[in-house]
């Protein structure tokens, strides 16, 4: 459960920051592959970004951790992400 919370908080900070008014479609593909795809799908989604080997390894470790979550939880994280991204709140600067 801690992994799911960590991923959700990470996605919120990236997706709703004032610097991300337009979200990179490639990022969303990587995120979807991370949560719902196979390890090879995830690695293929990362490939266009040409990550250094240490970054690639860290991403693969994260993918393996995410894969330990129940499928329903991963699907619900995707639904939560979609809800957040389509929310009018993402158009506002929510920082205190």
Curated annotation (Swiss-Prot):
<dbReference type="GO" id="GO:0007165">
    <property type="term" value="P:signal transduction"/>
</dbReference>
<dbReference type="GO" id="GO:0050727">
    <property type="term" value="P:regulation of inflammatory response"/>
</dbReference>
<dbReference type="GO" id="GO:0005615">
    <property type="term" value="C:extracellular space"/>
</dbReference>
<dbReference type="GO" id="GO:0071774">
    <property type="term" value="P:response to fibroblast growth factor"/>
</dbReference>
<keyword id="KW-0964">Secreted</keyword>
<dbReference type="GO" id="GO:0032689">
    <property type="term" value="P:negative regulation of type II interferon production"/>
</dbReference>
<dbReference type="GO" id="GO:0009410">
    <property type="term" value="P:response to xenobiotic stimulus"/>
</dbReference>
<dbReference type="InterPro" id="IPR043215">
    <property type="entry name" value="Secretoglobin_1C-like"/>
</dbReference>
<dbReference type="GO" id="GO:0043488">
    <property type="term" value="P:regulation of mRNA stability"/>
</dbReference>
<dbReference type="GO" id="GO:0000122">
    <property type="term" value="P:negative regulation of transcription by RNA polymerase II"/>
</dbReference>
<dbReference type="GO" id="GO:0005737">
    <property type="term" value="C:cytoplasm"/>
</dbReference>
<keyword id="KW-1015">Disulfide bond</keyword>
<dbReference type="GO" id="GO:0005635">
    <property type="term" value="C:nuclear envelope"/>
</dbReference>
<dbReference type="GO" id="GO:0042098">
    <property type="term" value="P:T cell proliferation"/>
</dbReference>
<keyword id="KW-0732">Signal</keyword>
<dbReference type="GO" id="GO:0010193">
    <property type="term" value="P:response to ozone"/>
</dbReference>
<dbReference type="InterPro" id="IPR016126">
    <property type="entry name" value="Secretoglobin"/>
</dbReference>
<comment type="function">
    <text>Binds phosphatidylcholine, phosphatidylinositol, polychlorinated biphenyls (PCB) and weakly progesterone, potent inhibitor of phospholipase A2.</text>
</comment>
<dbReference type="GO" id="GO:0042130">
    <property type="term" value="P:negative regulation of T cell proliferation"/>
</dbReference>
<dbReference type="InterPro" id="IPR000329">
    <property type="entry name" value="Uteroglobin"/>
</dbReference>
<dbReference type="GO" id="GO:0032696">
    <property type="term" value="P:negative regulation of interleukin-13 production"/>
</dbReference>
<dbReference type="Pfam" id="PF01099">
    <property type="entry name" value="Uteroglobin"/>
</dbReference>
<dbReference type="GO" id="GO:0097160">
    <property type="term" value="F:polychlorinated biphenyl binding"/>
</dbReference>
<keyword id="KW-0593">Phospholipase A2 inhibitor</keyword>
<dbReference type="GO" id="GO:0030141">
    <property type="term" value="C:secretory granule"/>
</dbReference>
<dbReference type="GO" id="GO:0034097">
    <property type="term" value="P:response to cytokine"/>
</dbReference>
<feature type="signal peptide">
    <location>
        <begin position="1"/>
        <end position="19"/>
    </location>
</feature>
<protein>
    <recommendedName>
        <fullName>Uteroglobin</fullName>
    </recommendedName>
</protein>
<dbReference type="GO" id="GO:0019834">
    <property type="term" value="F:phospholipase A2 inhibitor activity"/>
</dbReference>
<dbReference type="InterPro" id="IPR035960">
    <property type="entry name" value="Secretoglobin_sf"/>
</dbReference>
<dbReference type="GO" id="GO:0051384">
    <property type="term" value="P:response to glucocorticoid"/>
</dbReference>
<comment type="subunit">
    <text>Antiparallel homodimer; disulfide-linked. Interaction with LMBR1L is controversial.</text>
</comment>
<dbReference type="GO" id="GO:0034021">
    <property type="term" value="P:response to silicon dioxide"/>
</dbReference>
<dbReference type="GO" id="GO:0032713">
    <property type="term" value="P:negative regulation of interleukin-4 production"/>
</dbReference>
<dbReference type="GO" id="GO:0032714">
    <property type="term" value="P:negative regulation of interleukin-5 production"/>
</dbReference>
<dbReference type="GO" id="GO:0032496">
    <property type="term" value="P:response to lipopolysaccharide"/>
</dbReference>
<comment type="similarity">
    <text>Belongs to the secretoglobin family.</text>
</comment>
């Amino acid at each position: 459960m801690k992994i799911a919370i960590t991923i959700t908080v990470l996605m919120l900070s990236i997706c709703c920051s004032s610097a991300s008014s337009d979200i990179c479609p490639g990022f969303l593909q990587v995120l979807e592959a991370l949560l719902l795809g196979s390890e090879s799908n995830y690695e293929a989604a990362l490939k266009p970004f040409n990550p250094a080997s240490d970054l690639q390894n860290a991403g693969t470790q994260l993918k393996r951790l995410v894969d330990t979550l129940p499928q329903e939880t991963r699907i619900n994280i995707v639904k939560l992400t979609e809800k957040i991204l389509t929310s009018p709140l993402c158009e506002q600067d929510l920082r205190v």
